[in-house]
Amino acid sequence: MRKALLLLSVLALFGCSKAVNTPVLTIEGGQVQGVTTELPGVIVYRGIPYAAPPLGDLRWKEPQPVVPWQGVKLCDKFGHPSYQAVHYPGGYTTEWGYGDESPYSEDCLYLNVWTKASGQPDKKLPVALWIHGGGYREGWGTEPEFYAEEWGAKDVVLVSINYRLGVFGFLTHPELSAESPHGVSGNYGILDQIEALKWIKKNIAQFGGDPDNVMIFGQSAGAGSVKTLCESPLARGLFHKAVIMSGGGLNIPQAAPAAAPAARPGAAPAGRPAGMPANMSAMRFRPMNIKEAELATKEVMDWAGLTDLKKMRAASTETIYALSTIYNGASGKYGSITGSPMVDGYVSLESFDDAARDGSLADVPYMIGYTLNDMGNMSAGIAAFCENRQEKGGKAWAYEFARPLPDDGSHPEVTARLKGAFHSSDLWFVFKTLKYCWRPWTQGDWDLSEKMLTAWTNFAKNSDPGLGWEPCTKENPGFMLFKLDANDAEASEVGTPIVP
């Protein structure tokens, strides 16, 4: 019942969106008109194409220029998410209220803009590019927890994107590499993100944004994408600060939780719930080797009779998506088709860890953190990254989200899997989208969300989150601890919490 009411409220909100008196903007490809939101002055532009549909001969190619359109495009509907598996009820599917999104498609290169300064290029508001997570194989930039009208109300122009996922976003193959002028294949999803940054550089002033003050931020695989962008030479100069959420820090084998020698009185003891693998996330986002990936993909494609690019590109979306699974079942062997970023010598020259340590990482301010019940012990790797930034003359702010999400017992299919301050639980708070969720939020939750939204938007504006939050350094290894009360953080990993 609650989900039905949530869906009705979202539909009603969209139904009330109007293009009455909203500015018509001229951007790359043609003219666009946005629609109003429920927050005064905030306009959203949904489903703006930022590249040509990657279909047919453009499958597994770098993003190509957007196809121009005639007349004024009314941007009142979100674009297609990248093709992915159907999501069944339970866990994250129910938590995020999936089910009302556009059909999944390879035609997915669309972005959305929330702004209070549409048609005012002199405003020069800070810009934030949101990159969604989902293991590089699922998710989209317009899930309900990502609705960004609150960011617009804080005078930040927020852009969210869809990008190619899974086999469509990261496949490598020897013939694709031979076809490429750069001699490599894969990383198409990262190239999509870079194309979105280029789109921002060329077009965001029309929405009141400053192309010279751009923050990139992402969570989980979105954080992994941010890490790749911070290492990639192709993204250099297109962004000016970065936020890494639940993407780990530096990889430290057998890392113990970060602990300061002189923790504040009452600080929670270091610890991790039993059974949680150590340092899982930091390893998860290490790029793959391209030659290994090419050979593995070729084996599967050849088995299916897709022995050249013409056949590979002529195969249906469904065939390509299911191919690895079919191969595994029919052959009795494990077949792997690339599904994540890799070091290729073009988009990515080395791992994030290596770039951080050799000093070639993007020299920008960083925010980096995790949730208490995240996908492994991240605090030590995060502290190590912050120390690394200090050694290189930069700054990084660290945080832990320690608020266990409230539960009224109405969705056991969710809470059986997602407990406490679980992986991704901070997203409702960062976007201040609690109203779209079924959970019984308290006033304290709303207040905490406002603090987090303020910190993130402050960072977008000023490269400093404020709130008395100081950079994490070797001498001052403090993590901002986002919580409601002392009970929220009784299992906190951090040695020196900073409470807002």
PLM regions and their residue ranges:
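Sec-dependent N-terminal signal peptides
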Residues: A4-L13
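Non-catalytic accessory segments of hydrolases
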Residues: C16-N187, P211, L372, W441-S449, ...
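Mobile gating loops/cap/lid regions near enzyme active sites that modulate substrate access
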Residues: A85-V86, T325, E391-P500
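Alpha/beta-hydrolase active-site loop
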Residues: E106-C108, H182-Q206, N289-L295
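Substrate-access "cap/lid" subdomains that shape
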Residues: K198, K202, K227, R236, ...
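Alpha/beta-hydrolase fold nucleophile elbow
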Residues: F207-Q219
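A short, hydrophobic beta-strand element of the alpha/beta-hydrolase
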Residues: I216, V243-M245
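Glycine-rich nucleophile elbow surrounding the catalytic serine of serine-hydrolase chemistry
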Residues: G218-T228
